[in-house]
């Protein structure tokens, strides 16, 4: 099936509509089910008492040569297994599953082999913050002064100190900083987007080419 790219949300819902079975396992190409998670899933699905409509997986990320065990990155629970008629993907650019039913949090990890290196991560941040800024503009996000100043700082403090990202050494520090940087850039790009949409006097855009 080939079609024009409609965005992450619509594409996700379209893909799910093609499935023929009751349960949907929706994972990215860089995610793997650990043997322990496989057995846990099988145990629940084969149980006669199973009355769940979806399952959250704790996602453990491989980053800069180490497994991240703390901070905002772990456990990063994702609703990845659900009944087809109970779920709908919403939001952009990070499509989120909206479940009409009950979900259970599993204990075993889904393994996430993320960025190849920091250059790969920064490129991904650049791409997704572009899309995030556009979506926030559509949603009418208000004053940006507070967002630019405090949201990135709060995210760093939350991930590195409150959620003990410091226990993961240098990779934990870099993860906390780049998460904070992502937040800063999406609001900075929203500000830039609004400036570009305002009438400019005496500016020759060709000078930047």
Language model features with spans:
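Catalytic metal- and UDP-sugar-binding loop of GT-A-like glycosyltransferases, i.e.
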Residues: 3, 27-29
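Catalytic-site signature of metal-activated, phosphate-bearing donor transferases
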Residues: 10-17, 23, 27, 34-196
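Short, low-complexity, charge-dense intrinsically disordered segments
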Residues: 200-209
């Amino acid at each position: 099936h080939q079609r024009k790219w409609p965005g992450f949300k619509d594409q996700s819902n379209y893909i799910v509509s093609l499935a023929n079975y009751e349960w949907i396992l929706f994972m990215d190409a860089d995610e793997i089910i650990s043997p322990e998670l496989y057995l846990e899933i099988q145990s629940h699905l084969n149980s006669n008492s199973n009355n769940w409509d979806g399952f959250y997986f704790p996602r453990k990320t491989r980053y800069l040569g180490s497994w991240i065990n703390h901070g905002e990155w772990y456990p990063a629970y994702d609703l990845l297994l659900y009944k087809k008629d109970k779920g709908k993907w919403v939001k952009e650019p990070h499509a989120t599953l909206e479940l009409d039913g009950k979900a259970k949090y599993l204990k075993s990890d889904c393994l996430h082999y993320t960025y190849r290196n920091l250059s790969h991560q920064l490129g991904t941040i650049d791409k997704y913050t572009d899309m995030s800024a556009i979506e926030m503009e559509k949603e009418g996000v208000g004053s940006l002064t507070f967002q630019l100043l405090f949201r990135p700082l709060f995210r760093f403090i939350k991930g590195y100190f409150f959620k003990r990202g410091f226990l993961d050494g240098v990779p934990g520090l870099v993860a906390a900083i780049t998460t904070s940087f992502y937040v800063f850039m999406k609001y900075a790009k929203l500000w830039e987007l609004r400036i570009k949409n305002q009438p400019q006097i005496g500016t020759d855009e060709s000078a930047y080419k």
